[in-house]
């Protein structure tokens, strides 16, 4: 696993967003994942809650671009990526947000164990 591989995990997630299918996106999260989403005050603790978030979020037709990233290879089974990304929505509006992902290797490939995303305070 190297920086390009970790960035590829984001690309996989972003491609899942483009399907507009919440189950496709949720499948990238570990069963015990935690999501602190960009446009919701509710912490999501499981697949049911994560899917519920993406049902609403995907209605906006989001596509993300990573503006800055910081990859850390913690072990053979755990990696992080944090930085800033910008979402462009179907209506042309945009939001920049800070993000952090903790990925864990599993029998099904790499899964998102923790995902935190928060809109930039200055807008």
Positions of predicted regions on the chain:
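A beta-strand edge to alpha-helix "cap/lid" segment located at domain peripheries
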Residues: 1-24, 34-123
């Amino acid at each position: 696993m190297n920086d390009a591989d970790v960035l590829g995990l984001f690309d996989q997630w972003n491609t899942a967003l483009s399907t507009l299918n919440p189950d496709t996106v949720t499948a990238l999260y570990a069963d015990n994942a935690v999501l602190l989403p960009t446009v919701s005050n509710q912490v999501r603790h499981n697949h049911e809650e994560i899917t519920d978030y993406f049902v609403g979020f995907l209605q906006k037709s989001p596509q993300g671009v990573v503006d800055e990233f910081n990859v850390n290879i913690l072990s053979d089974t755990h990696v992080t990526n944090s930085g800033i990304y910008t979402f462009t929505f179907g209506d042309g509006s945009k939001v920049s947000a800070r993000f952090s992902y903790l990925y864990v290797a599993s029998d099904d490939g790499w899964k998102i164990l923790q995902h935190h995303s928060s809109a930039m305070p200055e807008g």
